[in-house]
Amino acid sequence: MEPPHILIVDDEPNIVMSLEFLMRKAGYRVSIARNGTEALEAVDQTAFDVVILDIMMPDVDGYQVCRHLRQRPDRAGSRVIFLSAKSREADIEKGYEAGADLYVPKPFSTRQLMQQVQQLLPPSA
C-alpha cells in the first residue's frame, strides 16, 4: 500500500520547505503547489489524502481552492487543513464554511500539525 499523499499549498518558500521536510521524514508522499492556480491544477489531476492550504495567495485564494475541491465528488476523501495567518474568528468560520476539516492559525507548532495530519488520515494510513 502506498503511503498517504499530501499536497502543500503555500506561497511562502520557508513554510513549504519545512513542511515538505517534516512530511517526507514521516514517510508521506509530498507534492507542492506554490500558489492557488497550481493547487487547482494539482487537485484536478490527483486525489490527495490531505491538502495543507494557505489562504492568502496572490492569484487564487485558499478558500476558492477548498470550495473547488469540495465540488468534486471524486475528491470527497481529501482532507483539508487551512494553515493561515488569518486568525480572526470570522476568518476561521469562513474556512470551515468553505469545507476545511481543520483550521490552524500561523504561527503553528509543527509537532501539533503532524499529529493533526495523522488524526485526519484513515486508520490504515
Residue spans of the language-model regions?
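Active-site beta3 strand of CheY-like receiver
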Residues: 47-52
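Short hydrophobic/Thr-rich beta-strand motif most characteristic of the beta2 strand and flanking loop
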Residues: 27-34, 42
